[in-house]
Amino acid sequence: MKEVNLVLGVIGADVHAIGNKILEYALTNAGFKVHNLGVMVSQEEFVKAALETDAKAVLVSSLYGHGEIDCRGLKEKFIEAGLDDVLLYVGGNLVVGKQDFSEVERKFKAMGFDRVFPPGTMPEEAIKALKEDLGLM
């Protein structure tokens, strides 16, 4: 596989790091070049990293339930930066309270995310989706 740059991070005030490290490990082992921004990442930091690394995809996670607030407007920032062709993935515990995941997925796709993953998604599922969406299969 040719080198494909990805940006990975946990958005907003979220400090949940374990899943982020697991994803970094799995994505690296799958052959991707991962630029992990860690936790408490702002929208602007995601955009800057995508520009600097020529990222083909950005994977945003949120586990503290405020992803809907933290992710609002992110796609617009990518478009403003000329990055409208960069894939945007989001996953985790994205909303407060129990909501039907199909409704959560609909909300995030309406915000411009290409893929939305529920809590408990295995890394292999995201890797498969990336390979499909990037034409690497």
From Swiss-Prot:
Catalysis performed (reactions): (2S,3S)-3-methyl-L-aspartate = L-glutamate
Functional pathway: Amino-acid degradation; L-glutamate degradation via mesaconate pathway; acetate and pyruvate from L-glutamate: step 1/4
Keyword tags: Cobalamin, Cobalt, Isomerase, Metal-binding
Coiled-coil annotated residue ranges, if any: none
Domain of life: Bacteria
GO MF annotation list: cobalamin binding; metal ion binding; methylaspartate mutase activity
Domain called B12-binding: residue spans: 3-137
Residues binding adenosylcob(III)alamin, per UniProt: 13-17, 61-63, 93-97
Signal peptide stretch: none
Biological role stated in the UniProt entry: Catalyzes the carbon skeleton rearrangement of L-glutamate to L-threo-3-methylaspartate ((2S,3S)-3-methylaspartate).
Quaternary structure (record): Heterotetramer composed of 2 epsilon subunits (GlmE) and 2 sigma subunits (GlmS). GlmE exists as a homodimer and GlmS as a monomer.
Family: Belongs to the methylaspartate mutase GlmS subunit family.
Name of the protein: Glutamate mutase sigma subunit
Source lineage: Bacteria, Bacillati, Bacillota, Clostridia, Thermoanaerobacterales
